[in-house]
Each structure stands twice: as structure tokens, then as C-alpha cells.
Amino acid sequence: MNFEGKLVGKDLKIAIVVSRFNDFITTRLLEGAKDTLIRHEVEDTNIDVAYVPGAFEIPLVAKKLAQKGEYDAVITLGCVIRGATSHYDYVCNEVAKGVSKANDISDTPVIFGVLTTESIEQAVERAGTKAGNKGSEAAVSAIEMANLIKQIN
């Protein structure tokens, strides 16, 4: 038997956790995610958005939403841009670990859509210009994973 998630969002309920820090980027990621979900037939009323202060706070809220059992997938969106200190490394590592742990505690897929870039230019490129929109890509992954989990269950 083969399992493959379809890219049809009809009847899916999706939560998005988005960081307000670097909102000039995260707003574009959110727009890309919502647009993609709607284009794949997810009803606007089935998309809930939770705003958190920064990327570090994303995993806790993603975990709580996944544990509720009300959503078919949770998308995480944020942007961490390297600065002059090691703060970047700690935040990136902890956010990635936290989102991974959120996947371990529920049957709800939690999708990692947090940009970790070396520069503002790289972030802008990944938020809807040269390198596409990573929010949109995260939405496609969420739809596919939600449908895949439904098939397996």
C-alpha cells in the first residue's frame, strides 16, 4: 500500500503561528501561506492565526494548538536574521527543536516555516521575491501532511 497526501485543502482546519518580530518579513510569509491555503480550497474561516512576540515563543503556542485536536495541521512562521552575536544560533536551534518536539506530542503535523537567514536580503528573497515564498511552501506541506495523516489513520 502507498500513502500520499493530496494537495486538496477542502474541509481542512489549519492553525498558523506567526512571529511579530521582523514583521516586515513575517507578514509576507503569512500572506503567502493564507493565499496558498485558500487556493487549495481551505475555507478562510478554517484558518486561525496566533501571533507571538518572537520566534522563540513559536514552539509553545504550536504545541498547545496541536494538542487541542481541533486542527489538521499547524504552520509555524517566523524570521531570525543573523546579527553580530551568538543569539541567532541559540534562537534558531531552540525554535527548530521546539517545533520538532511539538510534532512528537500529537498526531497533528506541525510545519516548520521559520526563516533562518544570514541577512535581511536573504529573508526578503524567501518572503516572496527571488526565492519564492516560504510561507506558501509551508502551507503546501501542511495540506499534504494533513491529508497523509488522515490516510494513515
UniProtKB/Swiss-Prot annotation:
Subunit: Forms an icosahedral capsid composed of 60 subunits, arranged as a dodecamer of pentamers.
Catalytic residues as annotated in Swiss-Prot or TrEMBL: H87
Species for this entry: Staphylococcus epidermidis (strain ATCC 35984 / DSM 28319 / BCRC 17069 / CCUG 31568 / BM 3577 / RP62A)
Gene behind the chain: ribH
Catalytic activity annotation: (2S)-2-hydroxy-3-oxobutyl phosphate + 5-amino-6-(D-ribitylamino)uracil = 6,7-dimethyl-8-(1-D-ribityl)lumazine + phosphate + 2 H2O + H(+)
Positions with a binding annotation for (2S)-2-hydroxy-3-oxobutyl phosphate: A84, T85, R126
Keyword set, alphabetical order: Riboflavin biosynthesis, Transferase
One BP term from GO: riboflavin biosynthetic process
GO molecular function: 6,7-dimethyl-8-ribityllumazine synthase activity
GO cellular component: cytosol; riboflavin synthase complex
InterPro entries (UniProt xref): LS, LS/RS, LS/RS_sf
Job description of the protein: Catalyzes the formation of 6,7-dimethyl-8-ribityllumazine by condensation of 5-amino-6-(D-ribitylamino)uracil with 3,4-dihydroxy-2-butanone 4-phosphate. This is the penultimate step in the biosynthesis of riboflavin.
Documented EC number(s): 2.5.1.78
HAMAP family in the cross-refs: Lumazine_synth
Pathway membership: Cofactor biosynthesis; riboflavin biosynthesis; riboflavin from 2-hydroxy-3-oxobutyl phosphate and 5-amino-6-(D-ribitylamino)uracil: step 1/2
Annotated family: Belongs to the DMRL synthase family.
Annotated binding of 5-amino-6-(D-ribitylamino)uracil, by residue: F21, A55, F56, E57, C79, V80, I81, F112
Name under which the protein is recorded: 6,7-dimethyl-8-ribityllumazine synthase
